[in-house]
Amino acid sequence: MSEHEIHAGDSLSSTQVQEETPETAEERDQRIRKAGRRRRLFTILPPVLLVLGILVLLYPVIATYQNNLEQQRIAKAFSAEQTNLGPDVLKDELARADEYNRQAAEAPILDPWLESQRPNTPQYSNCLSQLDVNPVMATVKVPSADISLPIYHGTETSTLEKGVGHLFGTALPVGGEGTHTVLTGHSGLGSATMFDHLNRVKVGDVFYIEVLDRHLKYKVTDIRTVLPNETESLNKVAGKDLATLITCTPYGINTHRLLVTGERVPMDDQQVAAESAKVEPAVIQTWMIAVVVGIIAVLIATAVLWGFARKNRKKREAEEAAAEVSAASGNGEGA
């Protein structure tokens, strides 16, 4: 055998000895500590991620519930506050609004979501000065769509995030022959219900508008879906008292506008007020319940899976510990 072959054999034997050398106690402790850190990480991380996921899912539920509750509180407070104004103030404010509707010049009616609907003009300022004894102009209730919301001046983004907006260029919502008021509401907001259910309304349904101490009832006569620039149906009609509720559609896409138009039903104010008072929309929506039920189901499933995983982990750790003890015993006997 050559000298080169002998050295190669010695090198191979040395490598095999190194590979077969058992780990020291210090190395074993380091390995165990690293494994423990990994186990703790994988034990803590899933619950943290689960809690974060639940909070993300619960946010729209909680936000929508609070906003719905607040909007209904404002609508109810509006009715109660009218008694504090006094009959003369109420009469004067309504007379001014009626006169405004009679004198308002015909103007092009534009889509509520256009930026040009926020004009800096004397005409717009005059409109804002009407029915301004309260921050809320009026309220609207739609029983078949589960709607009870305050109405504000204008259709600015900030306005439509807290309630319904009166579309500038249309009559104030005080009723009157030859008037047509247009009320705008969002649908698809992640933090409020607003006009989400306006598509439930059918011809023949009714809705109510309360403005100061005047109560108006409208019966739905027309429902249509149009493009944003198709506003002809929002014009006044001689001899008719009309109100249109408008929102974006389809849900979440918003390429069109849903128009729900009603004609005023001649009724005594007290009768309308009594009917309107019965409208009590649900603050909690069906989808909220579905989300909460889904979260509970996920929690139960997670608890079951975590229990199985924990049981298997303990079994595996016990087997590893037994194997280490056995290996240590074997090394001791070999020594």
Features from the language model and the residues they span:
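N-terminal Lys/Arg-rich, disordered targeting/topogenic segments
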Residues: 1-38, 316-335
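Solvent-exposed, non-transmembrane regions of membrane-associated and secreted proteins
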Residues: 28-284, 314-321
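C-terminal single-pass membrane-anchor helix
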Residues: 276-335
